[in-house]
Amino acid sequence: MKRLFLTSSFSSVAKLFEDFAGEPVKGKKLAFIPTASLVEKVRFYVDDDRKAFEKLGLIIEELEVSTATTEEIAQALEQNDYIFISGGNTFYLMQELKKKGTDKLLIEQINNGKLYIGTSAGSIIASPTIEFVSDMDETKKALELTDYSGLHLVDFYFLPHYLNFPFKEVTQKIVNDYSPKIDLRPISNNQVITVLGNEIKTLEKPKRGTKK
């Protein structure tokens, strides 16, 4: 059964993760893929997400797909309990995933039930295509990318950071341009889209002062 935890910011909704996983996550092993952030000047969100996983007690194995061999990638994806892909540039990420067939390895693992977690770019790639975020991410950072197909783990199109600074204007533009044409699912940094088999939900981090 397909299990996806698609976020704009994992660290913002980390408290919802264990409930979704349906098991104690302390001691579980996580393949942590920061590749999308390598071409970005701002990268604090990668550290924020890493710290959030560590706080939950997960054991992190960093997997840099742009430098790892296909064999190393396949082994890490197979041996870890969960797979996480960070935010950054969506087009560069997809370029690097396709170079060594990591995209196909991911699809195989996820279709076999491996729990997948994405932040921003790592969630966008679950969509059928990624072209719809070209106003948000620079395509020129992925000059070797020959097509804009995504992993197509879902039939909808994931849009992160909806109306959040500094993406307020660009996310609204994407909604205006694409929502009449495709099944666009915009979420804020405090929300997550979960996929459990055919069941799709949008959840929100509880506000302060509410019980959770």
Positions of predicted regions on the chain:
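Catalytic-core regions built around general acid/base machinery
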Residues: A76-Q79, K100-G113
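Short, active-site-adjacent cap segments at secondary-structure transitions
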Residues: F91, S123-A126, V192-T194
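A glycine-rich, often tryptophan-bearing local segment used as a flexible ligand/cofactor-contacting loop or short
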Residues: L106, L115, I124-A142
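C-terminal and late-domain segments of enzyme folds
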Residues: M1-K26, F32-I33, S37, R43-F44, ...
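Catalytic nucleophile loop
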Residues: F84-G87, I110-P128
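Short, well-ordered alpha-helix to beta-strand connector turns
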Residues: G57, N80, G113, V154-D155, ...
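Portal/gating segments that form or line small-molecule/metal binding sites
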Residues: S37-K98
